[in-house]
């Protein structure tokens, strides 16, 4: 009976840790990493690369909630296990260190190699530095820009000596779109809590404009690579809806466009980066 109860507690803790890691975005980034790695590596090696990315994303997600703990408690964020008291701080801190150590080992000694591994760790470091510092400054887009440019680049560098510029620019611009769209849903609570990054300083309207413009820029880049011209009018329509629809619909609309662009980015990357195994 005691063993069964202990197993249940351990399972509950694992599930709460996954919830605290911002599991949706973490899994999405991991999936994109795997899809980009498949043309360059055999499936088993691609899985190791995906695991390196997954452990890095866990670190970023957990440090985000650790840094925001007091603010989340003030706002009574019951959907966050740390803020609600369902998960102990020490447990998350310990899990973060374990995940970070695993990420370093998998990045440097796995298929990514030293060059690709260091670039990947640069991206992870940018994500963590955003949580601890940049989130509250007007330079808040910078870590996103660097991290999202590094993300596809590290996978390419594991097999090639250089990275296509279109992939670097598309990743960087998507990082800007991801940052501004991610902040939109919490714009007012962030301001009330004194979190004044670039989106909070510029305001909702300009943040929407930057997000929409970024998605259009990505669509133009992807169209030049994939020859799929439908992306550009779709991006313009999405940008129009950003301003016409109520604010509560803005984030789902942006994420829908982001998913479309990421899907095409993966397809374009696979087609142009394919190498014999």
Residue spans for each PLM region:
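Multi-pass alpha-helical membrane architecture of UbiA-family
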Residues: 2-277
